[in-house]
Swiss-Prot record:
A zinc finger (Matrin-type) spans 55-85, 117-141, 180-210, 230-257. Residues 151-177, 250-283 are annotated as: Disordered. One of its GO terms (cellular component) is nucleus. The keyword Repeat applies. GO terms for molecular function: double-stranded RNA binding; zinc ion binding. The gene is znf346. This is Zinc finger protein 346. Zn(2+) 1 binds at residues 57, 60, 73, 79. Keywords: Cytoplasm, Metal-binding, Nucleus, Repeat, RNA-binding, Zinc, Zinc-finger. Pfam families: zf-met.
Amino acid sequence: MERLVQRMYCLGMRDPPPANIMAQQEPNGDFPYLPSGAAEVNRMIKENSDLFSDSQCKVCSAVLISESQKLAHYQSKKHASKVRRYMSIHGSEEPIAKRFKPSGDDQSNVDEKDKYKACSVCNMTFSSPVVAQSHYQGKVHSKNLRMQSIGSQTPALPQPEAQAKKDDGMQGPAEQDPNRFCSICQASFNNPLMAQQHYSGKKHKKHMNKQKLMETFGPSTAPASTVKGYPCTVCNIELNSVEQYQAHISGSKHKNHAKPKKGPNAFAPPPDNYQPDYQYPTNEDCLEDPAEWDSFNVAYE
């Protein structure tokens, strides 16, 4: 270094050499300096392990995935510039190890900084806060976060007594809550979000339409365990959808089966309250005065 200074003075330069030149020429001096070669890079990492490692540079928020990338990063001018800026802001009077050991009051701030370096939910690391912010606002993080919350709310196994009540047909408090159980589809939910997704889905709407049709046209005579579609007991067939069922009951084939049969065995006696369209009058109705009816009988004899 003395030779460099003497040479610069010989060239007429009265001012001291620039700081970056001193940094490059003094690898054994004060930090920061720009290392040259793998040995100096490893030495710098070892002496400043709180800031640098073989896989990460905390000053630049850079993740290093290979040996060549590590050497290229730590020997770059961009890295040296950020280190000088970091040291000018934080100062060098306080030991590095002490600066990076958070106290109890600063633990929340450290956690806030750590979330911009890695995401424990998605098991990812970030090279900068901008990349981290983009990840936290993305669909992948939202999906993994939702799946983690669902997994943490997994219900416990039912007790034997509760299971016996369920087998007897008695509904518990959870089965009476629509956010926990759908009595129409016999489906249970872990949280209100799953319930909302179920109620807006096609399967639930299909069962709702089926229930309305059964209430309108009457229940099926077939066992409930074998009924998977929309049965017509008149024609003894089963339809797959609401549209097919409505088209069937509006068709001529169904109406022909629904009409009363004609033939010798098709006659049925009238009901007790049957009233004919025309009633024949009696004798009393024809002759209002009974004396007139007696005179009519004498004249006839």
